[in-house]
Amino acid sequence: MSLHEFDALIDRMKLAYEYAENLGQYVEAAKVLYQINDQLPDDLQLILEDLENPESAKSFLLKYNNELKSAIVNYRQRLMNF
């Protein structure tokens, strides 16, 4: 994945969080973040469960917010060092 592609992925993540915070679209936001997690290298991926329930999705967003952002920062630095 190129740095440009990764930055586009980050933009999707930010939009997902905005949906969750402003519109209460927790399930859709969690699905986007789940897809983003799949794009990360294996050693940076989080182990996540499928999310269909809005309460589970909200819990997911609150629980994994910092971990996913940290993994993203680590991967972006890897891409920059190539």
Annotate each predicted stretch with a short phrase.
Residues 1-27:
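Short terminal alpha-helical segments
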Residues 2-4, 77-82:
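Short acidic DE-rich linear segments
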Residues 6-8, 36, 64, 75:
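Amphipathic alpha-helical coiled-coil/heptad-repeat segments
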Residues 18, 22, 31-32, 59, ...:
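Short stretches within intrinsically disordered, low-complexity N-terminal or propeptide regions
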Residues 26-65:
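Acidic, low-complexity, intrinsically disordered interaction modules
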Residues 67-79:
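C-terminal amphipathic alpha-helix
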